[in-house]
Amino acid sequence: HWMVRRQRQMCIRDSDSTPFYGESGGQVGDKGKLSAKGLEIEVLDTQKIGNFHLHISKIKKGSINLNDRVKAEINTERRRAIVSNHSATHLMHSALRNILGEHVQQKGSLVNEEKLRFDFSHKQKLSESEIARIEQEVNQAITSAEDTQIIETSIEESQKLGAIAFFGEKYGDQVRVLKIAGDYSTELCGGTHVKNSSEIKSFKIISETSISSGVRRIEAISGDLAIKDKADNKTDLLN
């Protein structure tokens, strides 16, 4: 269904069947375009409300009516960067638990095309050595080049698989288990992810701070941005 607000400026599309990912689970919504003969619509954001997706859009050319058919195209380059950062978040979560201890629990996250942000329970500042070990573990998992496995199962079966569930999250009878880099990371997640861990390419932590008592925040980058950052820093060290 289409709802049009301020003709040629804004339209919102409700749909439970769309290639656009609606913002949820810390992952930002997709951008892209919708088109038809004589019609161009820029999708500025996608939000998820219940089973519906709201496509917040700007009509650039033409007009749209109820039941018009359109071609939907997401911004694939942007999605690719988001997917890389989301999968890297899962790998980093596993590395944090392996290196710092199982007391580490996710307290919040944000995944967009530029970086990942992950808040977690831990009482003290991470040392340079711990940060280096986390980066090393994540990059080793990336180079394992394992295919991502998606398992639709019951919450009980997911627990038997060792999947990490998040306190306070509401789960239905059926859940989606994501296994990234083999058995290295197993979590419940409804987001979009790489098909193979090698697609992440590289991982680099760019900051680690305290945001409240007992909660730390890591910001990191992956993919080509991480490769460029490492190359730039290597050049700096040589000069």
Which residues does each predicted region cover?
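Single conserved hydrophobic/aromatic residue that forms the stacking wall/gate
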Residues: 1-12
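A structural micro-motif recognizing beta-strand termini
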Residues: 15-20, 57-62, 180-183
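Short helix/loop capping segments that flank catalytic or ligand/cofactor-binding pockets
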Residues: 21-24, 31, 82, 128-129, ...
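Divalent metal-coordination and catalytic microenvironments
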Residues: 25, 90, 118, 177, ...
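Conserved catalytic alpha/beta cores of large enzymes that bind or transform nucleotide phosphates
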Residues: 33-149, 224-228, 233-239
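Terminal appendage regions of diverse proteins
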Residues: 103, 197-239
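Non-catalytic interaction/regulatory segments
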Residues: 114, 120-211
